[in-house]
């Protein structure tokens, strides 16, 4: 109920696919030990209900909004804006949505449930998600949005340590690219056998749970 206070109503109305899932991160519990108000990693409104504020923009005029990045932040921003009546479109440069949460899902499956919920919600709100779409200046100008929300996530660059350029050394960004198959240069650092294993893993979904 902390993650989604509407859970009982969604169950009774047959909308289980729109229930925001608890990912069991225990942020809510940890707040007690530091004497802080209750909060939730997947429900930013928890503890702030009394504010009763409209988030981001009002709907006095429907706006055309572009969200760059289909990770959890971008998808949640799109969901809130669409709920307020705006026309929202998401562009994602990769062929899959979810951002780095896809990596987190490999180790902890409940993380993937959050992405599935967001995807279900956006489908219900008729938000378009364009994959394999790089947000260039030319494309953005052609789209003519009223607002652009940049939710492309962080970069994971290696510190200036001697040897980081060696073929057996990968920084966080390169490892992410290997998992998603999006970093051609990182893949070139692998041996033929390693590249084969990577392809087999992706083909059999061993490296993709979202």
Q: What positions do the PLM features span?
A:
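Glycine-rich "HGGG/HGxG" loop immediately N-terminal to the catalytic nucleophile
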Residues: 99-100, 181
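Flavin-dependent oxidoreductase catalytic cores
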Residues: 1-68, 72, 77-83, 87-88, ...
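Rossmann-like dinucleotide/flavin-binding elements
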Residues: 62-90, 130-144, 152-163, 174-210
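N-terminal Rossmann-like NAD(P) cofactor-binding module of classical short-chain dehydrogenase/reductase
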Residues: 149
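N-terminal Rossmann-like dinucleotide/flavin-binding domain of flavoprotein oxidoreductases
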Residues: 101-143
